[in-house]
Curated annotation (Swiss-Prot):
This is CinA-like protein. Signal peptide: none annotated. Pfam families: CinA, CinA_KH, MoCF_biosynth. It comes from the Bacteria. SMART domains: MoCF_biosynth (SM00852). Belongs to the CinA family.
Length: 416
């Protein structure tokens, strides 16, 4: 007994539209504890869609379709489904009435081609669309097979899923067990290194632990399958706490917590402020810090010191040091951090200077070399050398630089 997602639309195959519907539905199925092993994207082609239905209907009990429900000629999902199951389409007057009301409320005239949206296979139930004009269907064309169709518009699909599909599935006995997960987030450690530290947890069966990696960050998803969220939390908590203990400072937060929100919380708790001086990131660090609502409580501002003259005039960087060591150096990073801290009167000053590329690198200072400077309220100033590699593009280096600088600040805040 499993579900399968079928997303219909040539625009998805061409990459013109991000397929966020499949991501949403996959998460929802996991949350409901409904097994889900396959997803398919197929273009607006009846014969290929029939092939997909043939395969999916022989391996899944619930087929969930998105897309292809509109009034245009390429909207073929409903009629293809009906044709596959040799069932006639029947016009539903209640759908016509609903569409007429919606068009009138919007001050528009309903054209004849919209009547196509009122055609459903004989015996199918209407899956109401509160937001749009294209309803879906809820149908059991044969025993042990349920079909649900949704528009491709994400807002409409989500509303229909939440208001109609979920209650139906639960009423049918699906979703008696839920899968509840907590995502633990780590920085400053690679996926393989973290996996080696916590490898014994990968053999657990309930909860399970699975690693994921993204740019500059590693995550561990701890998931439990139980009858209630409370039971799941009771299983997850001790495992999550042990993982955090093993990781130490490499662990920074969980679920929706971001590095910026965690740093902001610590600064707010301590009643401290921070300012930034940026060169190669050109405001990237300030942007990350201010992505958190209420960041004005602790973020005073920043100086983008891209040109060396700005480093000297606004941050007080020694011109002789610039000449001797270059802008990309530990001593300049330290002076930038101290300079912005003093200039803006904050407890902490953070600086970034480096070679983002693709040009500008040398044998001694290659693309990807970045220095992060930190100055604290106790007068201590230090810097950290980061080498992100010559193979990474400019935006990756800039992003890694901003988040690495923020993570250095987090660690210093926690140990001071």
């Amino acid at each position: 007994m499993s579900a399968e997602i079928i997303c219909v639309g040539t625009e998805l195959l061409l990459g013109d539209i991000l397929n966020s519907n499949s991501q949403f539905l996959a998460k929802e199925l996991a949350r409901l504890g409904i097994p889900h092993y396959y997803q398919t994207v197929v273009g607006d082609n009846p014969s290929r869609l029939k092939q997909v239905i043939e395969i999916a209907s022989n391996r899944a009990s619930i087929l969930i379709f998105t897309g292809g429900l509109g009034p245009t000629p390429d909207d073929l999902t409903t009629e293809t489904i009906a044709d596959f199951f040799n069932t006639p389409l029947v016009e539903r007057p209640e759908i016509i009435e609903d569409m007429s009301r919606k068009f009138a409320a919007r001050g528009r005239t309903m054209t004849d081609n919209n009547r196509k949206q009122a055609l459903l296979p004989q015996g199918a139930d209407i899956l109401p669309n509160p937001l749009g004009t294209a309803p879906g269907l809820l149908w059991q064309p044969r025993p042990n097979l349920t079909l649900m169709t949704f528009p491709g518009v994400p807002s409409e699909m989500k509303r229909m899923w939440q208001e109609t599909a979920i209650p139906y599935l639960k009423n049918q006995g699906w979703g008696k067990e839920i899968i509840f997960s907590r995502m633990l987030r780590f920085r400053g450690i690679g996926e393989s290194a973290l996996a080696a530290k916590v490898s014994q947890f990968f053999d657990l069966t309930n909860p399970t632990v699975a690693p994921y990696a993204s740019l500059g960050e590693v995550r561990l998803r701890v998931s439990a399958k139980t009858r209630s969220e409370q039971e799941a939390i009771a299983l997850i908590d001790p495992v999550a706490q042990e993982l955090q203990k093993i990781a130490g400072l490499d662990y920074y937060g969980s679920d929706d917590e971001t590095l910026a929100s965690v740093v902001g919380s610590v600064l707010r708790q301590k009643g401290e402020t921070v300012s930034v001086a940026e060169s190669c990131t050109a405001g990237g660090l300030g942007s990350v810090l201010t992505s958190v609502a209420g960041s004005s409580d602790y973020f005073r501002g920043g100086i983008i010191a891209y040109d060396n003259s700005v480093k000297v005039d606004l941050l007080g960087v020694n011109s002789a040091d610039l000449e001797q060591y270059g802008a990309v150096s530990d001593i300049v990073a330290q002076q930038m951090a101290l300079g912005v801290k003093q200039r803006l009167g904050t407890d902490w000053g953070v600086s970034i200077t480096g070679v983002a590329g693709p040009g500008g690198g040398t044998d001694t200072k290659p693309v990807g070399l970045v220095y992060v400077g930190l100055a604290d309220s106790q007068g201590k100033v230090e810097s950290f050398e980061c080498r992100f590699g010559t193979e990474r593009d400019r935006e990756m280096v800039r992003s890694l630089s901003a988040y690495t600088a923020l993570d250095h600040l987090r660690r210093k805040l926690l140990v001071r």
